[in-house]
């Protein structure tokens, strides 16, 4: 599902809200989540899951074009851990 598909689906479920209101709300939620992760904080949505940052250690990589070894810096990557309710819903639906 894309962001625009999510907005369309929410609009059909909540016809009292304008498409612009739904779009602005979805964008604001995603922006707040990105800002929270950017600040190094964790996001927990009970029953759904949690978002956090995992650190990837610096490592030696390889350039696929040339085969040369390349030094890759350490970095933080977003990580999602599904909650119990979401896992059960996906596995038993």
Curated annotation (Swiss-Prot):
Gene Ontology BP, a term: regulation of translation
Highest rank taxon of the organism: Bacteria
Q: Name one GO molecular function term.
A: structural constituent of chromatin
Family annotation (SUPFAM superfamilies):
IHF-like DNA-binding proteins
GO-annotated cellular components: chromosome; cytosol
Keywords in alphabetical order, please.
DNA recombination, DNA-binding, Transcription, Transcription regulation, Translation regulation
The record, for InterPro entries, names:
Hist_DNA-bd (IPR000119), Histone-like_DNA-bd_CS (IPR020816), IHF-like_DNA-bd_dom_sf (IPR010992), IHF_beta (IPR005685)
Q: Which residues form a coiled coil?
A: none
Complex and partners: Heterodimer of an alpha and a beta chain.
Annotated function: This protein is one of the two subunits of integration host factor, a specific DNA-binding protein that functions in genetic recombination as well as in transcriptional and translational control.
NCBIfam families found in the cross-reference section: hip, PRK00199.1
The entry assigns this protein to a family as follows: Belongs to the bacterial histone-like protein family.
Q: What name does UniProt use for this protein?
A: Integration host factor subunit beta
């Amino acid at each position: 599902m894309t962001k625009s598909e999510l907005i369309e689906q929410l609009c059909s479920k909540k016809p009292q809200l304008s498409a612009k209101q739904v779009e602005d709300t979805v964008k604001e939620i995603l922006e707040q989540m990105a800002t929270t992760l950017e600040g190094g904080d964790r996001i927990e949505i009970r029953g759904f899951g949690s978002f956090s940052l995992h650190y990837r250690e610096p490592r030696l990589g390889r350039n696929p074009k040339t085969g040369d070894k390349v030094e890759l810096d350490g970095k933080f990557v977003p990580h999602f851990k599904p909650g119990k309710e979401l896992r059960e819903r996906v596995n038993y639906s």
